[in-house]
């Protein structure tokens, strides 16, 4: 029987577009080696993700996929079953591919939440949280924060008013958090209310428009900025916030923690403190060389 992968090796991968700068293969393949796990993690760069593509992966022996831009919302629609975050927010960044069914998970929110708790837990207590953007990552992050019990108010600022309103409706309906869509112009007038800014759009990413999305006078030393873009780590938005004295959560931290959860979903093995430390060091070194 012809297959594209070695059946003695458990094969996983990442699907999205573009993927030339993805660090996910480094993360997963390194931890497989550290743990002596007979597995490999491949790159599947494609602009199209559909039922036929999932079946191709299944036929090729692919057991799990990390899903990134622009496929997170599509990934949810292709799954037969889904975790609560995926089901409620209608976006997934992880697919487990079984013989007869596909299961969707969203680890973005958990990754972001862990990052915030580690680097700036106070930012969840002192003011309102605003999420910039309304794509797949924003959905997972919004839900995880809403059900954490740590916040009471959430603002979503996006150029796409329809998806921003949808996220807010879903959050308000499924949690005790009051979520409110807000335009950029209005956000600028309410900056004193904000303690945490989470940027989830591609602006500032290598090869994308630089941004910065918000002006320097929006930020102050009482704010924290979490820009989930990690290539480069110092995006124009990060530099703008730094000049104003804002605290910065590195975007690579979300990549780290969401990948650790994916590793657990793929292999059934819980990552330990050493896995996290080693992966953080590898990411830091890789990003320094970019």
Curated annotation (Swiss-Prot):
SS bond partners: none
Pathway in which this enzyme or protein is active: Metabolic intermediate biosynthesis; chorismate biosynthesis; chorismate from D-erythrose 4-phosphate and phosphoenolpyruvate: step 4/7
Provenance organism: Leptospira interrogans serogroup Icterohaemorrhagiae serovar Lai (strain 56601)
Query: What terms describe the molecular function in GO for this protein?
Result: NADP binding; shikimate 3-dehydrogenase (NADP+) activity
A biological process term (GO) from this entry: amino acid biosynthetic process
Q: Which reaction does it catalyse?
A: shikimate + NADP(+) = 3-dehydroshikimate + NADPH + H(+)
Subunit structure as annotated in this protein's UniProt entry: Homodimer.
Q: Where is the active site?
A: 72
Question: What is the similarity comment for this entry?
Answer: Belongs to the shikimate dehydrogenase family.
* Residue sites binding shikimate per the record: 22-24, 68, 93, 108, 230
Role, per record: Involved in the biosynthesis of the chorismate, which leads to the biosynthesis of aromatic amino acids. Catalyzes the reversible NADPH linked reduction of 3-dehydroshikimate (DHSA) to yield shikimate (SA).
Under what name is this protein listed? Shikimate dehydrogenase (NADP(+))
Among Pfam families, the record links this protein to: SDH_C (PF18317), Shikimate_dh_N (PF08501)
């Amino acid at each position: 029987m012809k297959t594209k992968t070695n059946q003695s090796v458990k094969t996983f991968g990442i699907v999205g577009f573009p993927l030339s700068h993805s660090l996910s293969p480094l993360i997963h393949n390194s931890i497989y080696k550290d743990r002596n796990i007979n597995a490999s993690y491949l790159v599947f760069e494609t602009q199209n993700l559909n039922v036929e593509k999932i079946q191709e992966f299944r036929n090729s022996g692919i057991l799990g996929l990390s899903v990134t831009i622009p496929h997170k919302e599509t990934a949810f629609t292709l799954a037969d079953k889904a975790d609560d975050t995926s089901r409620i927010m209608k976006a997934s960044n992880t697919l487990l591919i079984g013989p007869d069914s596909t299961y969707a998970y969203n680890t973005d929110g958990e990754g972001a939440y862990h990052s915030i708790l580690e680097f700036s837990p106070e930012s969840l207590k002192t003011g309102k949280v605003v999420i910039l953007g309304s794509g797949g990552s924003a959905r997972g992050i919004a839900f995880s924060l809403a059900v954490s019990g740590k916040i009471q108010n959430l603002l979503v600022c996006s150029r796409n008013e329809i998806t921003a309103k949808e996220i807010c409706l879903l959050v308000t309906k499924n949690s005790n958090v009051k979520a409110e869509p807000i335009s950029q112009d209005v956000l600028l007038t309410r900056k004193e209310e904000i303690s945490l800014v989470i940027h989830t759009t591609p602006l500032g990413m290598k090869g994308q428009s630089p941004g910065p999305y918000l002006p320097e006078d929006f930020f102050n030393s009482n704010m924290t900025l979490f820009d989930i873009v990690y290539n480069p780590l110092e995006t124009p938005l990060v530099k703008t916030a730094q000049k104003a004295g804002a605290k910065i959560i590195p975007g690579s931290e979300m990549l780290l923690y969401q990948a650790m959860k994916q590793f657990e979903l793929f292999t059934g093995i819980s990552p330990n403190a050493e896995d996290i430390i080693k992966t953080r060091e590898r990411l830091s070194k890789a990003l320094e060389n970019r």
